[in-house]
Amino acid sequence: MMYEMVMTLATLAIGKIGAASDARNIRDYPLAGRELKKAAGMVQCLAEEQLPQWVSHKSSSDTLGKDLPVEASIGFCEAFQILCLAVGQQMAVATVLAKPTVPNYSLLAKLCLGISEHMELFNSTMNSKAALEKEKIDSDFFTVIAFETQFHRALSLYFSARSLWDAHDFGVAIPMMKDAIAAMETRKTSASKGIPAIKSKTSYLKFLSDDLKETRSHMESLLQSWIKENSTIYYEDVMSVVPREKILQKGLMMMKPDPYMFEAVEPLLLSTDFRKG
């Protein structure tokens, strides 16, 4: 019965993720974020409560992990909770950007760096605690994770540059934007820095190709307008390197799992004798 219970809860979590993925427009993103927080709470419950109990009651002849679905792994559930929160925060960032008012660029920089850090933490947790389960997952999925990690790190630099420019720190904003553009470039090898290449029409990243081109074009256009504006109006010395104290050292993760708890229920009778004595 333990296996059935674990897989039932895992399926509920996947259902929440499926509901979140059905978000078709910006109005649905807040709901998607809430669904992902619920999913994170469910897999957290599996990782911290239910699966450890199962492991403690298994006999020495049982093999936990080798022949089971990835959802029945403590390490995978730990990692998946991290991923759910990262994607949930993506929904929050997108919601802010869709509003007509000027956003808080400094806050967005911290949120995007928090997303990047959690994507990276998801991957490292899979490597350290769920290596067997990782082998069962399509490797292209982890290319998407690498893309998301670097893309949001580049966005963090971009929003930091916007914040510096608005604060009239023009000489630092310009090199910060240059760093953001460099971070958005396609990496030369899988071990080098940059965005993974979109190699084929079958890649999971193919749908992002046009958006990526548009983002790069926007960043370059904004940089050139800043350079022109600074050289004709502000005349501020432009630094060759962004000072360390101006670079965010740690991101912000606002998303937290919604705790999932099993309700205490009365035992159900297997049969009832209605005969009168």
Regions found by a protein language model. Give the residues of each.
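Eukaryotic intrinsically disordered, low-complexity segments enriched for acidic and Ser/Thr/Pro residues
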Residues: 1-2, 71, 99-107, 127-277
